[in-house]
Amino acid sequence: MSRRPARAPFAFGGVEVAAGRRHELSLPISQLVTGADVTLPVHVLHGREDGPTVWVSAAIHGDEVAGVEIVRRVLERLQPTQLRGTLLAVPIVNVLGVMAGDRYLPDRRDLNRSFPGSARGSLASRIAHLMMTEVIGRCTVGIDLHTGADRRSNLPQIRCDLEDPQTRALAEAFGAPVLFHARLRDGSLRAAARETGARVLLYEAGEAWRFDEYAIAPGVDGVLRVLAALDMVDPADVGLTEPGPDAVVDAPGPLPGEVPEERTTDVPEATDATGEDTEAVHPDVVDGEQDSPYLVWQSTWVRARADGLVHLDVSLGERVSAGDRIGALYNSFGRRLAHVKAELTGVVIGRTEAPLVHRGDALVHIGGWDT
């Protein structure tokens, strides 16, 4: 009986990683003013058998640390000897932002608006170029991990092109409560990666600067489910005891269930609605049972109509109807200034966690079904 020939090593960063092995590399980015090197950390897991090449990245914004923990836990559960294909994991893309405790780079550029970048451009452009040439350009599928901004929390959700059948199948495999059809933004990692032909899932969950278990645990399982859907791992080998959802409900109108008694529904005012745990349970997340993810085709932020203190009556994952009273704004004397009302029928996919707001501040992000 002839032996199967050994899989060729994977050349990366000047190193050849043998089949069935893992290697940690640091790709040079720049230097600090002290002369200390700044490098991009990359884990290479080169499977013993052939399969796709996939990347997972986190902390493209320096305050989005939950993704770093997701990558750590995913790597704990993966063995390259059981892997088919190759995984490139980048736990921190915006190294300088993380070092400085800042969402952005020292030059105040948003790294996620700097792709595909240039080898001779700004610092942001150079980091983007390094990611594109060394990581993204070698992969057919990618998962980019994000959280909400400072003092904003997000319901776990996948943002992607739901009109592409292959991308949608991977999004369904991930198993997040919300699948959000999101347009591509110029300069984003996702847009640049799509130009290479790669399918990309963007996972949004939790809040900046926090290890929210309700965001991390589903993210870990979701990444592993995608690898299983690509036949890169066997579910039992990576601790997946339950498969992801096998059906997606594309709701044409309000979701089943009654409006909670304490909430009042008004006739909608004339507004522009187009504007814009391990039991992983956030204290606010998901009102009632939910068997399948929500498909979200549009969204709107409800904004503050006055300056003051906001009290919100809706939680992440809660269903609302246009016109519902979902909170109120008060002044410092405790007098109510305005009701906060839903401008769209759908599900709460994000909300502010800041009690002090100014007129025009984003309060509640609602995802809706209508295209």
Where are each of the predicted segments found?
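Structured catalytic-domain cores with a bias toward divalent-metal coordination
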Residues: 1-371
